[in-house]
C-alpha cells in the first residue's frame, strides 16, 4: 500500500482492509507511542466542498501522528476560481506534500486527482460516488460493536441515490459476504442499479427494497441512517417534500433489537431525534472517533511510516 492512492476500497485486498482496522485499534491504545510516526510529513487537504468532520478528522489524524497540514476548505479559496484544473492543482501541490486528501462535488474527481499527483491521494468523497474512509470508519464501528463485519442484517435508510457513504459501504460489505441488505427509501431516492448489481453478483449477499422503516426495523442488526442531501437537489420543492420521510425516534427504537447499532455518517438534520443520542444503540459518535483512527492508520500506511511496535495481521499480504 505504500505510495498508493485510495480512490475506492476496490484497490485494497480484504486482508489489507482488515489490517487497517487492526492498525486503528492499535493506534487507539498506543497514542503516546505513535505520536511521532509521521514527523516531517505534510498532508494537503483539498476540500472543494464544505466539510466539518471529514476535513478535521483527516487533519487531526496527521497532527496526532506528528505531521503537519496545509490546504483549503472551499472552492472559493482555490485557484479553481481562476480556471485552474484539478490536474494542474494536484501536480502543483504534489511538490509540497507527502500525501493529499481531496473532496470534490464531481464524481470521478478523486480518480483524476490520483492520476495527476506524484504522491498518494486519498478520496474524501467525490460527488455521489464513493467515500472510502467513511466506509473504513463504518467497518471499524461494526467490528467494535459486533466483533465481526459479516453475518449481519444491515438496513440502510434515507437517501440511497446520492448517498456515497451508502454506496461505498454496500460494495465493501459485499466483498466480505454474508450480509443481508434492507434498502429503505422512497421511490425517488432508491439505490442506483450499479450498486444493486454488485449485491446480485455476490452469492452470499441478498437485498430487499422497502419504503416503511417500522415494518423492518425489528429484523435489523444495523440501521444506517442518512440525511436527504439538499445540495444534491436541483429543485428545492423536491427536497422539502422528501426531507422528513424517515425520522428515527425512541418510539421507533422500541421496535428494534436491544443489540441493534444505529449508524449515521453525519451531519444529521432531523432524521435522528436528539433523544436517541442517549440510547446505548446510538453508535454515530463512535463512528466519528473511529474515523480519525482509521485515517491515522491509512495516512501512515500510504506514506510508508511504520507504527512503533505494531505487527501486521499478515505482513506479506498487507504490504503488497
Model-based region annotation:
Residues 1-56, 60:
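Positively charged, low-complexity intrinsically disordered leader regions
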Residues 48-61, 144-225:
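Glycine-rich phosphate/diphosphate-binding loop of Rossmann-like nucleotide-binding domains
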Residues 199-276, 281-282:
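Rossmann-like adenosine-cofactor binding region
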